[in-house]
Each structure stands twice: as structure tokens, then as C-alpha cells.
Regions:
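Phosphate-/nucleic-acid-contacting segments
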Residues: 360
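N-terminal localization/anchoring segments of enzymes in phospholipid and broader phosphate metabolism
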Residues: 1-348, 352, 356, 396, ...
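Helical hairpin unit composed of two closely spaced alpha helices linked by a short loop
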Residues: 367-389, 393, 398
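Thr-Gly-centered strand-to-loop micro-motif
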Residues: 364-365, 392, 422, 441-442
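Flexible, glycine/threonine-enriched loop-and-boundary segments that flank and lead into catalytic domains
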Residues: 416-421
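Catalytic-core elements of nucleic-acid end-processing and repair enzymes
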Residues: 430
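Short glycine/threonine-rich loop-to-helix capping motif typified by GTGT followed
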Residues: 376, 402-406
Length: 509
């Protein structure tokens, strides 16, 4: 009689998440205890640890790396001279673990020629757009394409029916890559189609971030999917160990159907993204659907990750687009960024849009935790007369990060940037749109983790009709927002001190 409730209780208590959290917490406590016990009274060891911290600081000063990240660690080491150097060695080096880096770089090098820029794709662009496109094509490398139709979605529930319809039409393959999967209405609708298509012989593959999906999936998820002939890779699996490897997450959102249709944006496969579940009020997001030549970039992105961990294809040509739209609509350029190299591609795209803007830049971002370079770019654009508007959430999902975001408001307002908070709920979209000339829609937040630690993706639009669609979405959204004034940014002395500490440590959050 009581057996089933007892089993459910024990399953809830002794699940993977609980065990992982408890073991990691115990390791942290043990390491701290061992550190203080071992160093107590040992002058030579204290001196050695301080010397290590000094050497780490000197190394950071010379290192060619984002200044905000370096300053954050230097401050932390200054506050904790004994522990700071050791913490940096354990957690501070943002290069991925050796096995992760070697596997992915090997595949990317082999297939670099798959992403060569075809001639004549950007000839009709203005010089500013052409220069940005050339940069992404060279240092991504992700080429730009003319023969691509795009459609912008202003929320997840608008995108979802079209996504299901495209999945239903799959004949050859379906590739999905997401940060968050969570059981519920949205995932169930997708899963039913995936199971049916896999049974029909369609090649169905799924990559999901193990950390992002840790709370949302049953422990036997991979086994169940593989039995249904849906092949799975949990990216960078979470293990109950204190490890730098856990820093690097797959934050991308990608769907590719038959090489002809692709989706990306901020929408994950969980119910809040289509407002089937209310977590922080109304969930405002954005996504984009591509059809045509530019889908190839997303196909290669996915296959590179897949073949790094489950080597299968040496030739990607079988997955190339076979259907192109009849009408050309500007230029479309999907791109990805990762911590595998020292090229800050995602940040540079945002900085370039700001620096080249002449009339306006409208920005959706759920978080604002940026370095001085990005902060200066926002202020400089506003100071030269560009209409710069930032739209952020009114209801936060992370209160400390929300406090950090607000700590940037006053200097931006003083420079002339206009800031809005989306009062109906949480704004999760990540978009830039400028001058009716260029736009970016993707998974990339304006914070250090997205810009430098995570695997991310986005789509650049040049002189495309959906740039106007994004601008109109912003214009419809602004009346639902509260504009922030300087008077809203007043705080007391403890609040100012907290904001200062958060700003200093923002690269570490």
C-alpha cells in the first residue's frame, strides 16, 4: 500500500541531481578544510602560495585575454592572496579540457574546407556590412549566402507549430542541438515526431547539454532514445567532481531538417519557452527559421560536434541543401563561437554593429554583465547620436545577475543609452538590429559566459526583409516595458558597495 509513495520519495531524494550537488558540496568543504588545516602555522607554505598568486597576477597582466576577465581574477586573488592563485589554476583558465579541445579541433580542421566562402555572395552589400561578413567568413570561418529565405519569430509559441510542421516533412535527416531539454508539452510534441520519423528510417540525432538538461530529463533518457533509434550525445556530461571541464557548456539552439531548413535563436525545448508553463511571468523570446543555402553552416556546426564524439562521417556533402528559394532576400550568415580558440567572434560581431551604427541599435538581452570594451561601445554609440536602446527582463530568473545587470544602468543612462525592462515577465531573446541594415538573432547573451566560455551560435542578416520584422517586434514590445530613468538607479551605501563588488566579479559569474 505504501510501497509506491516510498519508492517515489527515495527516487526524488536519491536522484542524479541531488547526488551530484551533495558530492560536489562535500568536495568543496573538504578541500577548504584541507587547505586551511595544512597551511595553518606553515609559514613557508603561506609564502609559496602568496608567491604563486603574484606569479598568476603577472601572468594575467601579460596574457592576451579579455581585460574584464583578467581584472576580475586579479581582484579575487588580491582579496584571497593565499587561495586566489590556486583557485585560478583550478577554475580560471578558460581553455577547454584537453580531451574536449583536441577532439573538436581535429574535426573542425578536417572539415574547414566545407565552410569556404563562395565568390560573389556579398558583392551587393554596403562596405560596412561586407567588412563584417568578411571577418566572420575568415575567422569563423562561416560563409555568407544569398540564396536563403528567412522568417523571424517574436516568441516561442509562434515558432513551435512551424517547427513541428517542418519536422513532419523530414525525409532524410533531423539534427537537433539544445542547451535545455525538459519533459513537458513542448518536448513531448517534438519527441513524438522524432520517434515516428526514426521508425520510418529518417536519420535522427540529438545533442543536448547535460548540465542544462540535468533537472529536466529522466535518468534513462539516452537509453530510451537509442531504443527508438534516436541517437543521442549528452554534451560534456556532468560528473560529481569539482572540475574546470564543467565551465564549458553547449548553449546553442539548432534544428536542421534535410539540410534545407534550420532554426536557431533563444528558444530551448521546454514548456516555459512556449508559455505552456509560467515561471517568471510571460516568457518573451525570439527565433529565426532559414531555408536555403545558409542552412549549410548549421549542418556543418552540428556535424562537427557530433563527429568529435561519435565519429561517423568523413564527407558532409550528402547533407548539403537540395532546395533553394526562388527569391533572393539579402544575405544570411549563420555563425558559431566557442572557447576552442582565442578569437572572440561573438563579441566582435556585437561590437562591430555598435561601432558602425548611424541611426539606431535596438538590443534584446536577458543579462547585462559586460566588460569595459562593450560598455564603452554602447556609450560611444549613444554619445555620437545613435538611438541605442537596451531591453531587458522586468522579472528576473536569477536575482543576483539581475542586480548585476542593473548596476550598469546609471553610466549607460548618463551617456544617453535608453534602457527598458519588459514588465510582463522574463525577456530571454538575444537580438541586435541596426539601421534596417543588419541584425543578429541567436543564443548569445551579453555576459562573459556566453561571449567567452560557452559554445554559441547566431545568424547575421544583411539587407534582409526580416530585419524590419525584428525592428517592428521591438517597437511593439517597447510599450509593454518600463523605461528606466536616472532616478530609478538611486541606491544606498551598502547597495552601492554590493554593486561595485558584483561589477568587479562579473566575469566570474
Amino acid at each position: 500500500m505504501f510501497r509506491l509513495p516510498i519508492v517515489k520519495f527515495f527516487n526524488r531524494i536519491f536522484n542524479r541531481v541531488t547526488i551530484t550537488v551533495v558530492l560536489v558540496a562535500l568536495q568543496v568543504l573538504w578541500l577548504l578544510w584541507a587547505f586551511w588545516s595544512f597551511t595553518a602555522g606553515r609559514v613557508w607554505l603561506n609564502g609559496a602560495l602568496k608567491a604563486l598568486s603574484i606569479m598568476i597576477v603577472l601572468y594575467l597582466v601579460r596574457k592576451d585575454e579579455n581585460s574584464a576577465y583578467k581584472i576580475g581574477w586579479i581582484v579575487l586573488i588580491g582579496l584571497l592572496p593565499l587561495l586566489g592563485g590556486a583557485l585560478y589554476l583550478a577554475f580560471g583558465n578558460k581553455a577547454p579540457a584537453k580531451y574536449l579541445r583536441e577532439r573538436m579541433q581535429k574535426v573542425e580542421q578536417v572539415h574547414q574546407t566545407e565552410l569556404a566562402q563562395p565568390e560573389g555572395q556579398t558583392d551587393a552589400l554596403d562596405i560596412s556590412s561586407r567588412n563584417l561578413s568578411r571577418y566572420v567568413a575568415k575567422f569563423g570561418p562561416y560563409p555568407a549566402w544569398k540564396d536563403t529565405a528567412a522568417h523571424y519569430f517574436s516568441c516561442g509559441e509562434e515558432m513551435y507549430p512551424q517547427l513541428l510542421a517542418d519536422l513532419e516533412k523530414a525525409e532524410k535527416f533531423i539534427f537537433l542541438e539544445f542547451f535545455i531539454l525538459r519533459s513537458g508539452k513542448m518536448w513531448d510534441g517534438v519527441e513524438q515526431i522524432l520517434r515516428r520519423k526514426a521508425a520510418q528510417g529518417v536519420d535522427v540525432r540529438l545533442i543536448y547539454d547535460d548540465f542544462g538538461s540535468l533537472l529536466g530529463l529522466p535518468s534513462d533518457f539516452v537509453i530510451r532514445m537509442e531504443k527508438a533509434h534516436i541517437r543521442c550525445i549528452p554534451f560534456n556530461p556532468v560528473v560529481p567532481l569539482v572540475s574546470l571541464v564543467m565551465n564549458h557548456r553547449d548553449h546553442r539552439k539548432i534544428v536542421v531538417v534535410d539540410g534545407n531548413v534550420a532554426y536557431t535563436g533563444g528558444v530551448n525545448l521546454a514548456d516555459e519557452y512556449i508559455n505552456a508553463e509560467q515561471r517568471f511571468g510571460y516568457w518573451k523570446d525570439a527565433a529565426i527559421r532559414l531555408e536555403g543555402a545558409a542552412v549549410w553552416n548549421f549542418t556543418v556546426m552540428f556535424l562537427n560536434v557530433w563527429n568529435a564524439f561519435r565519429p561517423q562521417e568523413t564527407d558532409y556533402t550528402a547533407f548539403a541543401p537540395t532546395r533553394l528559394p526562388a527569391v533572393q532576400d539579402g544575405v544570411v550568415q549563420p555563425y558559431a563561437d566557442s572557447p576552442l580558440d582565442e578569437e572572440p567572434l561573438a563579441e566582435t560581431v556585437y561590437l562591430d554593429i555598435l561601432s558602425q551604427a548611424q541611426r539606431y541599435v535596438y538590443i534584446y538581452t536577458p543579462y547585462l554583465a559586460v566588460g569595459e570594451e562593450m560598455l564603452d561601445a554602447l556609450k560611444s554609440a549613444a554619445k555620437r547620436g545613435v538611438d541605442v536602446r537596451l531591453i531587458l527582463p522586468g522579472i528576473p530568473d536569477k536575482k543576483l545577475v539581475f542586480r548585476l545587470s542593473r548596476s550598469y544602468y546609471l553610466p549607460l543612462l548618463r551617456a544617453g543609452v535608453r534602457i527598458y525592462e519588459f514588465t510582463p515577465g522574463f525577456l530571454h531573446a538575444k537580438c541586435y538590429v541596426s539601421d534596417d541594415r543588419v541584425a543578429a538573432v541567436g543564443s548569445i547573451n551579453m555576459d562573459y559566459r556566453s561571449l567567452f566560455l560557452h559554445f554559441e551560435c547566431g545568424t547575421l542578416l544583411f539587407h534582409n526583409s526580416q530585419i524590419a520584422a525584428l525592428r517592428k517586434d521591438v517597437e511593439r514590445t517597447l510599450p509593454q516595458c518600463r523605461e528606466i530613468m536616472r532616478s530609478d538607479c538611486r541606491t544606498n551605501l551598502p547597495g552601492t558597495a554590493l554593486d561595485s563588488v558584483l561589477r568587479l566579479l562579473s566575469p566570474l559569474m
